[in-house]
């Protein structure tokens, strides 16, 4: 099956699953997350990339008035694909934290958007580079932090990774993320757009080799150490003396969040 068609069908499946499990929830958008967004997905007999998504939902009047805890959960589909569901208020806070796993949905080619909120979504996408540079220092720290987390996880026998750890001694998916973070922070620090950073893969073959656990354990550990250390050095090189908050990006986020929730509440009340 042609790749894009397959991904579109999986997004639709996630949407239908969302409606079935959370029929009372008002959806803003469901967006693709993961390897397909940066050109590192694989579809072979040996390895098949999951199609995982993030869903942004809009709170109800009751949730706001009664100050209920905003939803933030992960629903696992029967095929083990993940659907992360998060209140728009929490999701926009994650934009401000500059976590690239949350920012990447602004640049995906695969999303289901609730037609009622298309105007707000289009405005969000029109300002995606602004939002992705809300706090450059924080973005750099986040990239370095992700590299460190992946390095710690690379040989840890998590239940879902136990087979890989027992067979290879490490999880190649974590190693390929360490290399990816190194590419990303270099491109970001050198002034490339966030969109360019997502697909900046000068060593793509090495990353695929890592993802498929084709390095020996000794090689993998050395690569992880070298790339993680270089990422830390690049973070220190590009960090500015003080954090600078992009006020225009903040205004955009506040405006979209306000207008989106207002539209939902107006419809609910009237």
Q: What are the residue ranges of the model-derived segments?
A:
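Generic structural signal for hydrophobic core residues of well-folded globular domains
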Residues: 57, 95, 182-189, 264
